[in-house]
């Protein structure tokens, strides 16, 4: 029996307006090499100047993950050669990062686990290599963009725990609004360090790094494949030969990892303090300002359960995504009940959006969905009719009340009007009334159906109550 050991390195691109060591814009999707300057290009004599906003965002993150802030930290040069690194070194942090040890709690299958965070440090991103046939091009727009690299302890024991940790981290940086964490655009990237060991053995065996994974699904598949590969090598007696310290890439088409290059040790990068940057001192004022963080997912979930009576699961679904949480709370402020808002947001609306990327792109805003929920709750329309209204809202837009009026979906809830229909139905079916009163309770459904058929649009709940009172 084997135990999996997983540690994750997550690169979060901070959403500052300008780069970390120069005033170039950080906007995504510009034409190649538009947002560059002598600092980005590593030209001789160009000196970096630290972006203070990046420091504030790092301190806010530290507060959110229960981590120590090193008020004195330094930047270091990480030396290696790669085409997208024009200086031939990356400005990073080594011995004294801004964020020290911290932790995050995760939950998998109802079991809670604490995952340690070793450190989080600021660094500049590299550029991007673009390969077109036999030609390779370099786009340096991304060079010098601020990154916060978050390094976990090797505390995760399976791919489910790794994904739970990543999703928690993803939510936190979005709630803090320090990053858009857009995985498709590379704002939230993950390197997974994976190894195995016999159960009960505390030794850490050879770890393999899987590089630049940018979707939760691919991260999980890559980890699972790599664990399977290492176990198979151990069982076949070729572990020492097949499992070496290296960097591997995940082939998304074939679902396998393949060797990219040997994995360097920290000594190979020849870190030394960057002589062009002064040590960073975080004073009390900056600490106080940066530590004013918003309500985080765990706190919000506890509040929704406590104050609105939501189930733990439903509250977890709501708070997992910042836009979803905002949508839900807007519905509450517009007068929808918490129970109705959960159902119509997470089941009905999201079920209709399907392939769309979350509620931020929903054609139905929170105010209109709240109005629909209120029309169900004040018995203007039935739940069945509300689904028709939502279909129209998604397809065409419009206002809830106008759609109800146009489709003639308004319920009849007047007791007198419903009673007159009930009396007419009972008078026409005297023999069945006698059978019902003699003990054939199943005939109640027949009477309900006849009333609903005779008077379309009547409130079913009212029909039930009034029928019971008439039949005695």
UniProtKB/Swiss-Prot annotation:
One of its GO terms (biological process) is glutaminyl-tRNAGln biosynthesis via transamidation. It holds the Pfam family GatB_Yqey. Transmembrane segments: none annotated. Gene3D superfamilies: 1.10.10.410, GatB domain, N-terminal subdomain (1.10.150.380). It catalyses: L-glutamyl-tRNA(Gln) + L-glutamine + ATP + H2O = L-glutaminyl-tRNA(Gln) + L-glutamate + ADP + phosphate + H(+); L-aspartyl-tRNA(Asn) + L-glutamine + ATP + H2O = L-asparaginyl-tRNA(Asn) + L-glutamate + ADP + phosphate + 2 H(+). SMART domains: GatB_Yqey. The keyword ATP-binding applies. It is an enzyme of class 6 (ligase). Disulfide bonds: none annotated. Keywords: ATP-binding, Ligase, Nucleotide-binding, Protein biosynthesis. It comes from the Bacteria. One of its GO terms (molecular function) is ATP binding. InterPro entries: Asn/Gln-tRNA_amidoTrfase_suB/E (IPR017959), Asn/Gln-tRNA_Trfase_suB/E_cat (IPR006075), Asn/Gln_amidotransferase (IPR018027), Asn/Gln_tRNA_amidoTrase-B-like (IPR003789), GatB (IPR004413), GatB_C_1 (IPR042114), GatB_Yqey_C_2 (IPR023168), Gln-tRNA_amidoTrfase_suB_CS (IPR017958). Its EC number is 6.3.5.-. NCBIfam families: gatB, PRK05477.1-2, PRK05477.1-4. Belongs to the GatB/GatE family. GatB subfamily. Allows the formation of correctly charged Asn-tRNA(Asn) or Gln-tRNA(Gln) through the transamidation of misacylated Asp-tRNA(Asn) or Glu-tRNA(Gln) in organisms which lack either or both of asparaginyl-tRNA or glutaminyl-tRNA synthetases. The reaction takes place in the presence of glutamine and ATP through an activated phospho-Asp-tRNA(Asn) or phospho-Glu-tRNA(Gln). Heterotrimer of A, B and C subunits. This is Aspartyl/glutamyl-tRNA(Asn/Gln) amidotransferase subunit B. The gene is gatB.
